[in-house]
Amino acid sequence: MNSTLQNRNRTNLERVSTDPLDTFPRRHIGPDSQQVDKMLKSLGLSSLEELVDKAVPAGIRLKKEPDLPKASTEHKILQDLKNIASQNQIFRSYIGAGYNACIIPGVIQRNILENPGWYTAYTPYQAEISQGRLEALLNFQTMIIDLTGLEISNASLLDEGTAAAEAMFLAYSIRKNEIAKKFFVSELCHPQTIDVVVTRANPLGIEIVIGNHESVELNEDFFGVLLQYPATDGKIIDYTSFIQRAHNVGAISTVAADLLALTLLKSPGEMGADIAVGSSQRFGLPLGFGGPHAGYFATKDEFKRSMPGRLIGVSKDSQGNPGLRLSLQTREQHIRRDKATSNICTAQVLLAVISSMYAVYHGPEGLKDIATRIHKFTSILADALKSSGFTISNDTFFDTITIQAGAKAKDILNRARSERINLREYKDGRIGIALDETVNSDDIKDLFKIFEVKNTDIEKLFSNSGNISDSFKRSTSYLTHPVFQSFHTETKMLRYIRKLESRDLSLTTSMIPLGSCTMKLNATTEMYPVTWPEFGAIHPFAPSEQTKGYKIIFEQLEKWLCEITGFAGVSLQPNAGSQGEYAGLLAIRRYHESRKETHRNVCLIPISAHGTNPASAAMAGFKVVVVSCDQNGNVDLEDLKIKAEEHKNDLAALMITYPSTHGVFEESVKEICQIVHSRGGQVYMDGANMNAQVGLTSPGEIGADVCHLNLHKTFCIPHGGGGPGVGPIGVAKHLVPFLPGHVLVDNTTGNEHGAVSAAPWGSASIVLISWIYIALMGSEGLTNATRISILNANYIAKRLEKAYPVLYKGKNGFVAHECILDVRPFKKSAEIEVEDVAKRLIDYGFHAPTMSFPVPGTLMIEPTESESLEELDRFCEAMLLIHQEILDVQNGTLDKIDNPLKNSPHTAAMTTSDRWDHLYPKERAAYPAPWSRDHKFWPFVGRVDNVYGDRNLVCSCLPVESYQ
């Protein structure tokens, strides 16, 4: 006994050294060395390297691992990041232009923004285990509908600029006059919005006319107009008569509106607008140097089937109870592909949830009080400036004034900087001041000092200041639903948030094995700095000398991503994978234009591609030509050669995913690239499956010219229940000059090409997560993570292949990081469909794998490297038990109609009801596996009726009793 203890103590002493103990790879990667050996043995392999040799073609393997800094540790990386963060300077930013500081209620920050129960969930395709955030998003839609005065709203877009661009495209797609090609944009719109709209218009052949809305001569050549409300200089304008002029020539009117201003001002709907767009940033979201923030999009009911983005609707479940779901999905890219209303996939769910909760917490009166207080402070400031001889350009305002400072401008701006205050500088010498929720009397006194205004008794003036003219004042009510009236104490709010959280399955519950989605660990250390004020309180248009910390992060991350991808340049601006695709295709388009080859407009896309691929290609102005796949799931080389040769004079690009969407490393990928290059085309690689490449191969090694990366997949940014995402693009050297730029900032790319996102660096505050992940893993850790992701997928494929045929494998019989299981035979043998298997998995405590993509009637599984062998086995056991249930249906032990699969998922209410009319016991419904009793996740609703929901579309809040 003593000898054993002595040996153990000696082993411990030998194991511990001066090296830090808080290394990260062992925390991130799920299986330990013993589990790895066990899985390898089940595959008949002796090492991870042998697995990689068999799964990954030798011709594309990297000769050496990426040259990255040595892996840091969790404690040290936060120390290092604090030092970097200290190089950002937190000024009071009154720049405005669509970005305003706000006060984030602690109950929302702590319990949603910083809560993995909210931020690790996936897009709510599986409605039954997503009812919490679906309700929060329904609240968001109701909030937008009420404030804009329109009839229907989506559940968020990426930002205000892209929302405006989407509005332009909607107007263009539904125009009745086919020759109408002009879109009017008011010169009073925010500059970044104009920039994004112009970028979107160019590939589509739309002519943007920027000018004064009062003097522009509209005619039938115009299909739409875009207006800012209040204007970028702060002026409040009643656009009613102009909108009528637009309608008279058949043009669709869009108003980009400030949500907080709409609590006091006449709504866009009251002015006759067809569409309202904007940002919900000032409803509880940090500035974050530009994002992420939730854009919004509202329109008239008649345009609902042309609307972009996710739409939450009310349906009913199998028990007749209300059930929320994603509605009208036939509009979207994953179904309509190049005919979709938008290429948007990931939106900004987490941010929309936060904004909706901000409105729930404050209620209509609270929001109105916030807006009124801001307006009163603005009025006091304006009056004081006018009394001191300054001219205010805008005679009407909500929170923003623009001052004619003349020769005093330079001194004023210098004094502002000395007070650590940012003001908006116009090229014509004017100065803008946009006040916000954080402003108090002391801030106003500091502004008086900056403008050398005589100090005024602010408290005395406050009560009588700020009367908005009746002609602009809002007369209609808003946020009348009880959800906005009921949760105004922290106790109530906390319990409401927790109630909704408990209805959603996230990574805090179990593995989410969605193929092509990479639901890996979002480590706590990676998430910490997102809410640090040094990163969160920075305005996106703050002077560069105040953002040196961000610059360090961007430069290092871009360098690391170049090393990982084998590319020469990276842009971090795209704030979603879909935007990355679009930006990458625009780079290809601009490259061809620079070579005087504007006729190159054909984009070849395999039939197995993600739906965003053809949607993005169409948006970039390309003609989509589909390439077939062979029986092994690979790109059909003969068909590719035929199509490439047929279109060689007009070939712009090929879009491919690697490993393929069929879950295999295609052996011929380099030949595929060569076929396209030899005919003048460029190769775009969809980076959705990059988690199987890092450290083993790279897009550059394979021969791609451009690739987007999903930082919310491969590089650990959480999915947020449907966003935020970040989709930077890497490009080869010849495409670097064609990366996106930005009208307001000297971008790192040094070019003048238009922006694809409203903020220069997109969702800047969350790229920190990926920076930390790479720094903690190092090259060796990242490469090992890739190996384990491939091991885990092959282990699952091996365990399940006898019950569910694995549809595609590589040359040596192995899959990549995901596998596709064929469920189609069970439809014929037992009338069991893929949806039945997916819903039954909920009863076992799992989110379903990806359903019916890329092959209908199949399940695509991606376990990632973060899941341990215990969790993989638990999932496999659930799938095998479901297979046994299918066999029980086949042999008659279970009824073909009334069985646990057809009736799944089973709620607690169903299984505790006194009435049970089914032909199988309650216990089998409720506790189908041993672990169910230890930790049971109960779906809040039974199976939701998709058809009923689309036929009876309701997209605003549920009745009162639902909130009791």
Curated annotation (Swiss-Prot):
Residues bearing the modification N6-(pyridoxal phosphate)lysine: K713
Disulfide bonds: none
UniProt key word Acyltransferase: no
GO MF, one annotated term: glycine dehydrogenase (decarboxylating) activity
InterPro entries: GcvP, GDC-P_C, GDC-P_N, GDC_P, PyrdxlP-dep_Trfase, PyrdxlP-dep_Trfase_major, PyrdxlP-dep_Trfase_small
Keyword tags: Oxidoreductase, Pyridoxal phosphate
GO CC list: cytosol; glycine cleavage complex
Underlying gene: gcvP
Role played: The glycine cleavage system catalyzes the degradation of glycine. The P protein binds the alpha-amino group of glycine through its pyridoxal phosphate cofactor; CO(2) is released and the remaining methylamine moiety is then transferred to the lipoamide cofactor of the H protein.
BP-aspect Gene Ontology terms: glycine decarboxylation via glycine cleavage system
NCBIfam families: gcvP (TIGR00461), PRK04366.1 (NF003346)
Amino acid composition bias (Polar residues), ranges on this chain: 1-10
Top-rank taxon, per record: Bacteria
Catalytically driven reaction(s): N(6)-[(R)-lipoyl]-L-lysyl-[glycine-cleavage complex H protein] + glycine + H(+) = N(6)-[(R)-S(8)-aminomethyldihydrolipoyl]-L-lysyl-[glycine-cleavage complex H protein] + CO2
Top EC group: oxidoreductase
Subunit record text: The glycine cleavage system is composed of four proteins: P, T, L and H.
Reported cofactor(s): pyridoxal 5'-phosphate
Protein name: Glycine dehydrogenase (decarboxylating)
Family: Belongs to the GcvP family.
Chain intervals for the UniProt region annotation (Disordered): 1-25
HAMAP family: GcvP
EC numbers, comma separated: 1.4.4.2
Organism, scientific name: Leptospira borgpetersenii serovar Hardjo-bovis (strain JB197)
